Amino acid sequence: MNTQQLAKLRSIVPEMRRVRHIHFVGIGGAGMGGIAEVLANEGYQISGSDLAPNPVTQQLMNLGATIYFNHRPENVRDASVVVVSSAISADNPEIVAAHEARIPVIRRAEMLAELMRFRHGIAIAGTHGKTTTTAMVSSIYAEAGLDPTFVNGGLVKAAGVHARLGHGRYLIAEADESDASFLHLQPMVAIVTNIEADHMDTYQGDFENLKQTFINFLHNLPFYGRAVMCVDDPVIRELLPRVGRQTTTYGFSEDADVRVEDYQQIGPQGHFTLLRQDKEPMHVTLNAPGRHNALNAAAAVAVATEEGIDDEAILRALESFQGTGRRFDFLGEFPLEPVNGKSGTAMLVDDYGHHPTEVDATIKAARAGWPDKNLVMLFQPHRFTRTRDLYDDFANVLTQVDTLLMLEVYPAGEAPIPGADSRSLCRTIRGRGKIDPILVPDPAQVAEMLAPVLTGNDLILVQGAGNIGKIARSLAEIKLKPQTPEEEQHD
């Protein structure tokens, strides 16, 4: 660390000046990697470990970080602090070694809280829409010339990174409720997009516990802070009297402080009007499809309006919004082999949504923007517990597509649960008589099993949170065409 870097570091986070070397266990995750990237740009020595390289680790290596693709005790040698992902178990050899060496071990949200401590923090929480809303707020603040720091759970496509160190006073961050670690954050402004039952193992299966945790998060706001909340969500509407802070509501509801009306989707863009108190109506063109994204934009506009950002900057940012990685991510439109003598094309869209509400929103956006397309979904359930807990909801939502192909459940470290597997879910959906799902037992067979169901006027949604994003990219690389054994060997 040179003198100039150290001076910059001290000016931004003076109380951390004794920290030199920060080690991340599970550094390849988007949330972990984003924080590591900001700290690397602040001048800290960064190291980290994960099981395999990915774009996040490559970006960090480009910034000078040392990355180990293993978990060994010696990796934490000389670290001032060890930051651990919630996916890492307590018996990880690096965690054990850190404790034995009396090196502090903290969760990622604690480090994010330290970054936020010396800035004007804007935290975006909620079951769905956090990543996109974080990107929208960041885009608006950047367009307004405020040069924010942001830390997002997904790739901000306009910036090409998950996180960026700005020189302005704002830090805009996605706040993760999955392990309740967002309670470490103390922002000035908090957005809550919605609250549904998810990650219930963290909350002992008690929805009241989850709701109270969100209230506790909002009570971390100072008394002069502001909560921005979607009043369309019934749980948020129920909780509003308990917030105890200044609030701004948004939604399609007539009593929303920032109200969406006259929504219309044309292809990938949403067009709508935002009505705000004591402001002229704002006529928005949003470069993101779906009513759910109009709500995300309304949240971002509510925050920006409160900050006094010019309407023109807001409108420019939303119209040019490039989205986030794996959120209705358009990967291309590819020509197909002639079907019944007629040639055609198929659009390929990759989406991270893995909760029934998210899948439903993606399907509705696809139907609204491309109503004449044959809608084909390749779905990978994520976690056996989620599949079990939301089984009927998944079965109901997935019947809305024209053709469904389903991969095996991505376990995310969980043991199988009888009846919460893809074969059972396919059987249940088939029994409802609307569609006949196709189980894909081997990901290598996806292109081969996809080809016969395409009509030449298709929109393919690749949906899920496991390793299905890699499958989507491989489909784009081969332009949806099944590979011969010779081609596979050549690849």
UniProtKB/Swiss-Prot annotation:
Record has Transferase as a keyword: no
Name of the protein this chain belongs to: UDP-N-acetylmuramate--L-alanine ligase
InterPro entries, alphabetized: Mur-like_cat_sf, Mur_ligase_C, Mur_ligase_C_dom_sf, Mur_ligase_cen, Mur_ligase_N, MurCDEF_pg_biosynth, UDP-N-AcMur_Ala_ligase_MurC
Family per record: Belongs to the MurCDEF family.
Localization (cell): Cytoplasm
Enzyme superclass (EC): ligase
Catalyzed reactions per annotation: UDP-N-acetyl-alpha-D-muramate + L-alanine + ATP = UDP-N-acetyl-alpha-D-muramoyl-L-alanine + ADP + phosphate + H(+)
GO cellular component terms given for this protein: cytoplasm
Any one of the GO BP annotations: cell division
EC number(s) on file: 6.3.2.8
Binding of ATP, residues: 126-132
Keywords: ATP-binding, Cell cycle, Cell division, Cell shape, Cell wall biogenesis/degradation, Cytoplasm, Ligase, Nucleotide-binding, Peptidoglycan synthesis
Cited function: Cell wall formation.
PANTHER family recorded: UDP-N-ACETYLMURAMATE--L-ALANINE LIGASE (PTHR43445:SF3), UDP-N-ACETYLMURAMATE--L-ALANINE LIGASE-RELATED (PTHR43445)
Transmembrane segments annotated in the record for this chain: none
GO MF, any single term: UDP-N-acetylmuramate-L-alanine ligase activity
Organism name: Escherichia coli O6:K15:H31 (strain 536 / UPEC)
Pathway: Cell wall biogenesis; peptidoglycan biosynthesis
